[in-house]
Amino acid sequence: MQLKKLSQKQKLYLLVIGLVVIFVLWMSGKLVKKEELHLEEMPIANEELFIFGTGETIEGLSVQEVYTDRGIYHFEGDMDFTPYLYQSIQAVTEGQEILHINNLLQREVRLENCLITENNSDQMCVFTEGFFIWLPCKNLQVQFQNEIADIYIANGSITKISKKKEFVSGKILSIRPEGIELEKYGIVPVSENFRFYKTYGDYEEKTTYELVVGYEPAKLIVAEGEICAAVQEKPISLEKIRVLLKTTDFAEMIHKEITVKAQGDYEIFYGGHRELLKTGEELQLNPQSDYLTENRVILIPQNDTSRLEITSIQRNYGSPIYAGQIEIMKESGGLMLINEVDLETYLYGVVPSEMPASYELEALKAQAVCARSYAYRQILLNGYAMYGAHVDDSVSYQVYNNLPTDEKVIKAVDETAGKVLKFGDEVAVTYYFSTSCGYTTNETIWENGTRENSYISGKLLNDTKKKLDLTTEEKFREFILNETEMTYDSGESWYRWEITVPLEQITENICSIENIGKIKNIQVTERNEGGVVQNVLLTGEKGTLELKHEHAIRVALNGKGQKIRRVYGKDAEGGNMLPSGFFVVDRVEEQGELKGFCFRGGGFGHGAGMSQNGANHMAEAGKSCEEILALFYEGTILSNI
């Protein structure tokens, strides 16, 4: 058959069709490749898993969860793990999901440093990773109760129990990467699979850093020269606090040298030696001192009236004087200084450093409760565990011993002795600050803040109990520019303030963060409860910059050295941050040219929790400590620790 010749038009048509087909195939290939790439990225694997139980056998697991030696896995459908309990399987997994069980394996598994809570002859209850697991055993004749052991399991039953009997106890001096430092033992290494169990009340598993320094919080189980587990059998009575004392002006943690002068007799303990430091005698230490050959010197008072003056540092009233025990440790770069003191005595030094001692007694009592609640939480948080302290003596925690105490402060602390604020069963978070703008705010002003603590919230500080929405620019501007709004703080000089910051200074501040050129505009784009700034957008000649959270915003927009006009009293000078985040901002122009920005605001401090000046004015109006705390921390109760 003779083929017909194609015309030019037909050839062009076929060419176009061919190109379309090629393109479609190419795209299909691309799509297939994308799919293949996606599948390759999914963590599909064959894993060996030991099955300890499912939601049917372990309380706390859902019906679609299984607990293994590699943690909790999920599964879909009606997959049955009953035939595989207390045995090893090979399974196909995708992340933490079991897709398919391949087969049963003959493998022994070890539960390391687990807590045996109880047992009978054919079952043993183990607490590990927050779960109680009943494991089958055969003719077990020994009774266990809250003991640490390694347990070996294979083929559906316990094959071996290796009980760990050796333990040490003693005051924990510090918790470091290289181990736990114990009084009389030094630093003892911690095993890689260390476990810490609380066995009173509800059983809990904790972390190493929840072992509270300065106490003997738990029995420490030792195996092969390492601490492998800890068991806390009863609550700790938190009667003492360990305070890291900073240098003059609270500038540094590390001291080049330390000089102490005894006001009363002290015993000096160092490297197994003991000496007496008598009244009036001085002890001067530097990193090369013979006293520090084993890195630590401890000075213990011989009676309750003995005090140590630290003459190498200065506070507002001169060289500070401390009750309690003083420890000096050699650290990289110099010496570290810690004061271990009774919690109530510590508050004698905190309350006057945080609130003027001349304030009303009921306000001082409220401050004492807040300071005690804060200190209690910080002891448990163990923030300076690496250095053997709970807090330092600066504004990073609570200012301590910066001003002398007096009889009214002692009375306020004593009349509230042992009292804290609680919300439910937990000690409350008790933020406080100097002066409000008339309205407070919540914890989300800070970068990691949440609304978890509902008692820290925005409220109008007067007796009207009015709720105001100050999150809009219009409403907040109306509120903050009203210098006569009657609240508990309205008689304070910082109740309303105004500062103008030149354009050059604002530009320099912002360009030190990010060079966006000369600033052209500042706009508050979001306000939190009470009207405090949450987000600010800065526009420069070279770009824009968004600032978030009140502290960062106050620092960036500071008018250091500029005059601050206050509603009452003398003008003040701007510092390293604006007085508060409760402000509005306006352009300052001359003949149409931008010259700077005017910030008009109210209050002094972050604005969350208790206004100290507001508390004092409430006390002046006849309010009690309980009434003051009920306003600022709504829903909390005053309770014994």
Residue ranges and their predicted role:
Residues 2-641:
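Conserved, single-site charged/polar hotspot
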